[in-house]
Protein backbone atom coordinates (compact mmCIF):
# COMPACT_ATOMS: atom_id res chain seq x y z
CA UNK A 1 0.00 0.00 0.00
CA UNK A 2 1.43 3.38 -1.03
CA UNK A 3 1.92 5.86 1.79
CA UNK A 4 -0.03 9.12 1.75
CA UNK A 5 3.19 11.06 1.06
CA UNK A 6 4.03 8.76 -1.86
CA UNK A 7 0.56 9.13 -3.35
CA UNK A 8 0.65 12.89 -2.85
CA UNK A 9 3.99 13.42 -4.59
CA UNK A 10 2.94 11.21 -7.49
CA UNK A 11 -0.20 13.33 -7.90
CA UNK A 12 1.82 16.55 -7.66
CA UNK A 13 4.05 15.36 -10.49
CA UNK A 14 1.02 14.50 -12.60
CA UNK A 15 -0.58 17.88 -11.88
CA UNK A 16 2.56 19.73 -12.92
CA UNK A 17 2.67 17.74 -16.18
CA UNK A 18 -1.05 18.44 -16.67
CA UNK A 19 -0.39 22.19 -16.46
CA UNK A 20 2.43 21.94 -18.99
CA UNK A 21 0.26 20.00 -21.44
CA UNK A 22 -2.42 22.67 -21.10
CA UNK A 23 0.23 25.32 -21.93
CA UNK A 24 -0.29 27.13 -18.64
CA UNK A 25 2.51 29.50 -17.60
CA UNK A 26 3.08 28.63 -13.95
CA UNK A 27 5.64 28.44 -11.19
CA UNK A 28 5.73 26.57 -7.87
CA UNK A 29 6.73 28.93 -5.06
CA UNK A 30 7.77 28.35 -1.48
CA UNK A 31 9.53 25.32 -0.04
CA UNK A 32 9.99 23.01 -3.02
CA UNK A 33 11.77 20.45 -0.83
CA UNK A 34 8.57 19.98 1.21
CA UNK A 35 6.55 19.65 -2.00
CA UNK A 36 8.80 16.90 -3.32
CA UNK A 37 8.71 15.10 0.03
CA UNK A 38 4.91 15.01 0.01
CA UNK A 39 4.85 16.59 3.45
CA UNK A 40 1.21 17.63 3.19
CA UNK A 41 1.95 21.33 2.80
CA UNK A 42 0.02 23.54 0.41
CA UNK A 43 1.37 23.47 -3.14
CA UNK A 44 1.54 27.20 -3.92
CA UNK A 45 1.39 28.05 -7.61
CA UNK A 46 1.45 31.39 -9.39
CA UNK A 47 -0.14 31.41 -12.84
CA UNK A 48 -0.29 33.98 -15.64
CA UNK A 49 -3.36 36.11 -14.79
CA UNK A 50 -4.86 35.72 -18.26
CA UNK A 51 -4.92 31.93 -17.74
CA UNK A 52 -6.54 31.87 -14.30
CA UNK A 53 -10.03 31.36 -15.71
CA UNK A 54 -8.99 27.98 -17.12
CA UNK A 55 -7.76 26.59 -13.79
CA UNK A 56 -11.05 25.40 -12.19
CA UNK A 57 -11.95 23.43 -15.31
CA UNK A 58 -8.47 21.90 -15.43
CA UNK A 59 -8.74 20.94 -11.75
CA UNK A 60 -12.02 19.12 -12.30
CA UNK A 61 -10.70 17.28 -15.35
CA UNK A 62 -7.56 16.31 -13.48
CA UNK A 63 -9.64 15.01 -10.58
CA UNK A 64 -11.77 12.84 -12.87
CA UNK A 65 -8.74 11.48 -14.72
CA UNK A 66 -7.03 10.48 -11.46
CA UNK A 67 -10.12 9.25 -9.57
CA UNK A 68 -9.95 12.11 -7.08
CA UNK A 69 -12.71 14.14 -5.49
CA UNK A 70 -12.67 17.92 -5.39
CA UNK A 71 -13.82 18.50 -1.80
CA UNK A 72 -12.90 22.17 -1.31
CA UNK A 73 -12.80 25.20 -3.59
CA UNK A 74 -12.20 28.30 -1.47
CA UNK A 75 -11.76 31.76 -2.95
CA UNK A 76 -9.61 33.28 -0.22
CA UNK A 77 -8.56 36.27 -2.33
CA UNK A 78 -10.14 37.91 -5.36
CA UNK A 79 -7.51 36.30 -7.60
CA UNK A 80 -6.61 33.24 -5.51
CA UNK A 81 -8.33 29.88 -5.02
CA UNK A 82 -7.53 27.06 -2.62
CA UNK A 83 -8.44 23.57 -3.86
CA UNK A 84 -8.46 20.35 -1.85
CA UNK A 85 -8.46 17.06 -3.75
CA UNK A 86 -9.16 13.85 -1.85
CA UNK A 87 -8.65 10.16 -2.41
CA UNK A 88 -9.44 7.04 -0.41
CA UNK A 89 -6.67 4.73 0.80
CA UNK A 90 -6.95 0.96 1.20
CA UNK A 91 -8.29 1.39 4.75
CA UNK A 92 -11.02 3.78 3.65
CA UNK A 93 -9.39 6.87 5.14
CA UNK A 94 -9.05 10.04 3.07
CA UNK A 95 -5.80 11.54 1.85
CA UNK A 96 -5.55 15.12 0.64
CA UNK A 97 -3.69 17.23 -1.91
CA UNK A 98 -3.78 21.01 -1.37
CA UNK A 99 -3.38 23.41 -4.31
CA UNK A 100 -3.25 27.17 -3.70
CA UNK A 101 -3.36 28.85 -7.12
CA UNK A 102 -3.21 32.59 -7.76
CA UNK A 103 -2.25 35.17 -10.34
CA UNK A 104 -0.45 38.10 -8.78
CA UNK A 105 0.19 37.49 -5.08
CA UNK A 106 -2.55 39.32 -3.18
CA UNK A 107 -3.37 39.45 0.52
CA UNK A 108 -6.31 41.27 2.11
CA UNK A 109 -7.15 42.95 -1.20
CA UNK A 110 -3.61 44.25 -1.71
CA UNK A 111 -1.18 43.17 -4.38
CA UNK A 112 2.22 42.26 -2.98
CA UNK A 113 4.05 40.59 -5.87
CA UNK A 114 3.17 40.88 -9.59
CA UNK A 115 3.58 37.50 -11.25
CA UNK A 116 4.73 38.56 -14.74
CA UNK A 117 8.41 39.20 -13.80
CA UNK A 118 8.46 36.00 -11.74
CA UNK A 119 7.32 33.95 -14.74
CA UNK A 120 9.87 35.65 -17.00
CA UNK A 121 12.73 34.62 -14.71
CA UNK A 122 11.50 31.10 -13.83
CA UNK A 123 13.81 28.12 -14.29
CA UNK A 124 13.24 24.40 -14.78
CA UNK A 125 14.07 22.22 -11.77
CA UNK A 126 13.55 18.67 -10.57
CA UNK A 127 13.51 16.77 -7.29
CA UNK A 128 13.00 13.22 -6.05
CA UNK A 129 9.58 12.50 -4.60
CA UNK A 130 8.75 10.43 -1.53
CA UNK A 131 8.58 7.25 -3.60
CA UNK A 132 11.76 7.90 -5.56
CA UNK A 133 9.98 9.33 -8.60
CA UNK A 134 11.45 12.46 -10.19
CA UNK A 135 9.21 15.52 -10.18
CA UNK A 136 9.94 18.21 -12.76
CA UNK A 137 8.58 21.69 -12.17
CA UNK A 138 9.03 25.40 -12.79
CA UNK A 139 10.76 27.23 -9.95
CA UNK A 140 11.15 31.01 -9.43
CA UNK A 141 14.55 32.61 -9.47
CA UNK A 142 15.98 32.44 -5.92
CA UNK A 143 15.39 36.13 -5.16
CA UNK A 144 11.77 35.94 -6.38
CA UNK A 145 11.07 32.86 -4.30
CA UNK A 146 12.65 34.41 -1.20
CA UNK A 147 10.54 37.55 -1.60
CA UNK A 148 7.29 35.61 -2.05
CA UNK A 149 7.99 33.20 0.78
CA UNK A 150 9.11 35.84 3.28
CA UNK A 151 6.11 38.07 2.55
CA UNK A 152 3.80 35.11 3.04
CA UNK A 153 5.40 34.23 6.39
CA UNK A 154 5.28 37.85 7.52
CA UNK A 155 1.60 37.98 6.65
CA UNK A 156 0.96 34.82 8.67
CA UNK A 157 3.06 36.13 11.55
CA UNK A 158 5.05 32.90 11.75
CA UNK A 159 8.56 31.93 10.75
CA UNK A 160 9.22 28.28 11.66
CA UNK A 161 12.62 26.62 11.34
CA UNK A 162 11.81 24.98 7.99
CA UNK A 163 10.88 28.36 6.53
CA UNK A 164 14.13 29.88 7.82
CA UNK A 165 16.09 27.13 6.07
CA UNK A 166 14.27 27.82 2.79
CA UNK A 167 14.93 31.56 3.04
CA UNK A 168 18.61 31.00 3.83
CA UNK A 169 18.97 28.61 0.90
CA UNK A 170 17.47 31.10 -1.56
CA UNK A 171 19.52 34.01 -0.19
CA UNK A 172 22.79 32.10 -0.60
CA UNK A 173 21.95 31.28 -4.21
CA UNK A 174 21.71 35.00 -5.09
CA UNK A 175 22.67 37.35 -2.24
CA UNK A 176 22.66 40.52 -4.33
CA UNK A 177 19.35 39.70 -6.00
CA UNK A 178 17.74 38.75 -2.69
CA UNK A 179 18.79 42.01 -1.05
CA UNK A 180 17.54 44.05 -4.00
CA UNK A 181 14.18 42.21 -4.04
CA UNK A 182 13.52 42.89 -0.35
CA UNK A 183 14.50 46.56 -0.42
CA UNK A 184 11.29 47.50 -2.22
CA UNK A 185 9.12 45.89 0.46
CA UNK A 186 10.92 46.00 3.81
CA UNK A 187 12.80 48.70 5.75
CA UNK A 188 16.57 48.58 5.28
CA UNK A 189 17.02 47.59 8.92
CA UNK A 190 14.78 44.54 8.42
CA UNK A 191 16.69 43.56 5.28
CA UNK A 192 19.91 43.66 7.29
CA UNK A 193 18.35 41.47 9.98
CA UNK A 194 17.55 38.86 7.34
CA UNK A 195 21.07 39.06 5.88
CA UNK A 196 22.62 38.58 9.33
CA UNK A 197 20.25 35.68 10.11
CA UNK A 198 21.37 33.88 6.96
CA UNK A 199 25.00 34.15 8.07
CA UNK A 200 24.54 33.36 11.76
CA UNK A 201 21.56 30.99 11.60
CA UNK A 202 19.88 33.01 14.37
CA UNK A 203 16.44 34.07 13.16
CA UNK A 204 15.05 35.23 16.50
CA UNK A 205 15.64 38.95 15.74
CA UNK A 206 13.66 38.58 12.51
CA UNK A 207 10.89 36.70 14.30
CA UNK A 208 10.61 39.46 16.91
CA UNK A 209 9.89 42.14 14.29
CA UNK A 210 7.30 40.10 12.35
CA UNK A 211 4.30 41.92 13.92
CA UNK A 212 5.71 45.33 12.98
CA UNK A 213 6.52 44.17 9.45
CA UNK A 214 3.04 42.71 9.08
CA UNK A 215 1.45 46.01 10.08
CA UNK A 216 3.67 47.85 7.62
CA UNK A 217 2.68 45.58 4.73
CA UNK A 218 -1.01 45.83 5.62
CA UNK A 219 -0.94 49.61 5.22
CA UNK A 220 1.71 49.99 2.52
CA UNK A 221 -0.60 49.62 -0.49
CA UNK A 222 -3.73 51.67 -0.95
CA UNK A 223 -6.78 49.88 -2.31
CA UNK A 224 -8.01 51.29 -5.63
CA UNK A 225 -11.68 51.08 -6.68
CA UNK A 226 -11.21 47.84 -8.72
CA UNK A 227 -9.55 46.10 -5.78
CA UNK A 228 -12.23 47.31 -3.35
CA UNK A 229 -14.98 46.08 -5.68
CA UNK A 230 -13.33 42.70 -6.21
CA UNK A 231 -12.72 42.16 -2.51
CA UNK A 232 -16.32 43.10 -1.70
CA UNK A 233 -17.63 40.70 -4.33
CA UNK A 234 -15.44 37.92 -2.96
CA UNK A 235 -16.84 38.40 0.53
CA UNK A 236 -20.41 38.36 -0.75
CA UNK A 237 -19.79 35.15 -2.69
CA UNK A 238 -18.23 33.51 0.36
CA UNK A 239 -21.42 34.26 2.30
CA UNK A 240 -23.63 32.90 -0.48
CA UNK A 241 -21.51 29.79 -0.97
CA UNK A 242 -20.22 28.71 2.44
CA UNK A 243 -17.31 26.30 2.42
CA UNK A 244 -17.93 24.72 5.81
CA UNK A 245 -20.32 21.87 6.58
CA UNK A 246 -22.51 20.51 9.37
CA UNK A 247 -22.64 16.72 9.80
CA UNK A 248 -24.22 14.42 12.36
CA UNK A 249 -23.25 11.02 13.75
CA UNK A 250 -24.73 8.95 16.55
CA UNK A 251 -21.75 8.28 18.81
CA UNK A 252 -19.16 10.53 20.39
CA UNK A 253 -16.35 8.24 19.22
CA UNK A 254 -17.63 8.50 15.64
CA UNK A 255 -17.54 12.30 15.88
CA UNK A 256 -13.90 12.15 16.98
CA UNK A 257 -13.06 9.90 14.02
CA UNK A 258 -14.74 12.25 11.54
CA UNK A 259 -12.87 15.20 13.07
CA UNK A 260 -9.57 13.32 12.82
CA UNK A 261 -10.05 12.11 9.25
CA UNK A 262 -11.41 15.35 7.76
CA UNK A 263 -9.68 18.09 9.76
CA UNK A 264 -7.21 18.69 6.93
CA UNK A 265 -10.01 19.52 4.47
CA UNK A 266 -11.32 22.40 6.59
CA UNK A 267 -9.84 25.38 8.40
CA UNK A 268 -11.31 24.26 11.72
CA UNK A 269 -13.28 21.38 13.20
CA UNK A 270 -15.77 21.77 16.03
CA UNK A 271 -17.30 18.73 17.75
CA UNK A 272 -20.61 19.28 19.55
CA UNK A 273 -21.92 16.60 21.89
CA UNK A 274 -25.60 17.12 22.70
CA UNK A 275 -28.93 15.34 22.99
CA UNK A 276 -30.89 18.44 22.02
CA UNK A 277 -31.02 19.85 18.48
CA UNK A 278 -29.80 23.45 18.15
CA UNK A 279 -32.53 26.06 17.97
CA UNK A 280 -32.94 28.57 15.17
CA UNK A 281 -31.12 31.34 17.02
CA UNK A 282 -28.18 29.04 17.75
CA UNK A 283 -27.98 27.99 14.12
CA UNK A 284 -28.04 31.58 12.88
CA UNK A 285 -25.67 33.15 15.40
CA UNK A 286 -23.27 30.32 16.21
CA UNK A 287 -23.32 27.58 13.59
CA UNK A 288 -23.80 29.56 10.37
CA UNK A 289 -20.79 31.89 10.96
CA UNK A 290 -18.66 28.78 11.56
CA UNK A 291 -19.85 27.23 8.29
CA UNK A 292 -19.02 30.42 6.38
CA UNK A 293 -15.52 30.30 7.92
CA UNK A 294 -14.82 26.84 6.43
CA UNK A 295 -15.47 24.97 9.66
CA UNK A 296 -16.59 21.35 9.84
CA UNK A 297 -19.18 21.19 12.63
CA UNK A 298 -19.67 17.60 13.83
CA UNK A 299 -22.71 16.87 15.99
CA UNK A 300 -22.68 13.71 18.09
CA UNK A 301 -26.36 13.14 18.80
CA UNK A 302 -28.48 10.02 18.49
CA UNK A 303 -31.54 11.41 20.25
CA UNK A 304 -32.49 14.19 17.83
CA UNK A 305 -31.99 15.22 14.21
CA UNK A 306 -29.89 18.34 13.65
CA UNK A 307 -31.59 20.54 11.00
CA UNK A 308 -29.50 20.96 7.87
CA UNK A 309 -26.86 18.42 8.91
CA UNK A 310 -25.57 15.64 6.67
CA UNK A 311 -26.29 12.36 8.46
CA UNK A 312 -23.35 9.94 8.31
CA UNK A 313 -23.31 6.16 8.73
CA UNK A 314 -21.72 4.28 11.61
CA UNK A 315 -19.12 2.55 9.40
CA UNK A 316 -15.94 4.62 9.08
CA UNK A 317 -15.44 3.61 5.44
CA UNK A 318 -19.05 4.49 4.52
CA UNK A 319 -18.82 7.73 6.51
CA UNK A 320 -15.73 8.90 4.69
CA UNK A 321 -17.08 7.89 1.31
CA UNK A 322 -20.41 9.64 1.88
CA UNK A 323 -18.74 12.82 3.13
CA UNK A 324 -16.34 12.87 0.18
CA UNK A 325 -19.18 12.36 -2.30
CA UNK A 326 -21.27 15.10 -0.69
CA UNK A 327 -18.44 17.62 -0.88
CA UNK A 328 -17.56 16.58 -4.44
CA UNK A 329 -21.15 17.05 -5.62
CA UNK A 330 -21.18 20.51 -4.08
CA UNK A 331 -18.19 21.52 -6.21
CA UNK A 332 -19.02 19.50 -9.34
CA UNK A 333 -20.48 22.54 -11.11
CA UNK A 334 -17.66 24.87 -10.10
CA UNK A 335 -19.61 26.43 -7.25
CA UNK A 336 -16.60 28.11 -5.66
CA UNK A 337 -16.95 31.27 -7.69
CA UNK A 338 -14.72 32.77 -10.35
CA UNK A 339 -11.32 34.35 -10.34
CA UNK A 340 -11.98 38.07 -10.60
CA UNK A 341 -10.13 40.22 -13.09
CA UNK A 342 -8.33 43.17 -11.53
CA UNK A 343 -6.77 46.18 -13.21
CA UNK A 344 -4.74 48.14 -10.72
Task: List where the protein language model places each region.
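Conserved nucleotide-sensing/catalytic segment adjacent to the nucleotide-binding pocket
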Residues: 267-310
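Structural motif
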Residues: 49-50, 102-104, 248-252, 273-277, ...
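Conserved beta-strand segments of alpha/beta enzyme cores
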Residues: 25, 270, 338-340
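A short acidic (Asp/Glu
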Residues: 37-41, 256-257, 307
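NTP-dependent small-molecule kinase module
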Residues: 210-238, 307-344
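Glycine-rich phosphate-binding P-loop
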Residues: 245-264
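Conserved NTP-donor binding/palm subdomain of two-metal-ion nucleotidyltransferases/polymerases, i.e.
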Residues: 1-41, 47-245
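Flexible, charged surface loops at secondary-structure boundaries
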Residues: 19-21, 39, 93, 239-241, ...
Amino acid sequence: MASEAHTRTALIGRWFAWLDRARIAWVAVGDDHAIAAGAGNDVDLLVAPRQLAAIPRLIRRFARANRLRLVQDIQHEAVARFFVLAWEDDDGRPGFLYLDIAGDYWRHGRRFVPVAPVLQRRVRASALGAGGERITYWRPAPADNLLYYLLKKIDKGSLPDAACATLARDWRRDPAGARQALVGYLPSAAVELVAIAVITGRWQPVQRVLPALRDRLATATRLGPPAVAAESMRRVLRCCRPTGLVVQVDESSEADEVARDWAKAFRRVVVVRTDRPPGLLCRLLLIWPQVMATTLVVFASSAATVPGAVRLAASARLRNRALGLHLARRHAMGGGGRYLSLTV
